[in-house]
Amino acid sequence: MKTFFLVGNSEKEGIKNALIKLEKEINIRGGICYKSFGYIQLKDFPSVDCVITLGGDGTLIRAARDISHLGIPIIGINMGHLGYLTSINKAKDISYMVDILINDEYFIENRMMISATVIREGKEFKTLTALNEAVITRREVLKTLRCNVYIEGDFLNEYSSDGIIVSTPTGSTAYNLSAGGPIIEPSSKMMLITPICPHALSQRSIVLSSSKVIHISFSDRIKSARELVVDGDESVSLENNDVVELRESEIFAGLIKLKKGSFLDNIRNKMNRI
């Protein structure tokens, strides 16, 4: 790798100094870098080999969604709290990371993403892509949602809950975990359906093959009360007769790993920080 695009979350402490250090480490090794705060616009930089984010998991997830259609791999420097997805912590390992990237000694994990399409009046209205999860949740009115879930056209269940999470394996350690869902090995090809605070003890998470197509419709008729949210920061309002279709996306996120490590080791290390 030679050309890098650096993305920093300006709200995190120490980002500017870390960006300066990272740019210096790349330049002294003969690399080229561009940098930005916030969302990525790579149309003017078609030759970028790698995107490096400085922030938390949220910064990496937003960047991964921005570039997933371009096939550019991404790596994150954790400047936040847990950092499940970022590869190094703080700025102390920047030199080590740059050496590995410049010398092409890394490897890439391809993570599946979910395509969430709102179907309105029989037509595709809006499609969002999620690396972690797609969530159907209530909005202004704090009332229970009643959602009908279908798998490959077959009725699964009517969930009475605060919402429904459809998660990727990558997202299994995020909102899904907080809602009582299982942890799934991140390189697997699965989708998880997890109700949020269900009003029945029998309503629990279900794990599906990523080849399945999920449709969710609504039994209630609460006006302007629900929305589809992906990865916690992109959303679309849902109407009573809308149907949400969820399937494995044709695109994926390529996460760079500096060394091969156990998924379980990573989970243990992160859990100990909570």
Where do the PLM segments sit?
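A generic structural signal for short beta-strands and their flanking turns/coil linkers
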Residues: 110-114, 130-132, 143-147, 162-164, ...
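Proline-centered loop/turn at the N-terminus of a beta-strand
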Residues: 71-73
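Catalytic core of DAGKc-family lipid kinases
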Residues: 82-162
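Short glycine-rich anion-binding loops that position phosphate/pyrophosphate groups of nucleotides
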Residues: 57-59, 82, 170-172
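N-terminal glycine-rich "phosphate-gripper" loop used for MgATP/nucleotide binding
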Residues: 53-57, 65-66
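ATP/NTP phosphate-donor binding region
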Residues: 1-50, 54, 90-107, 117-128
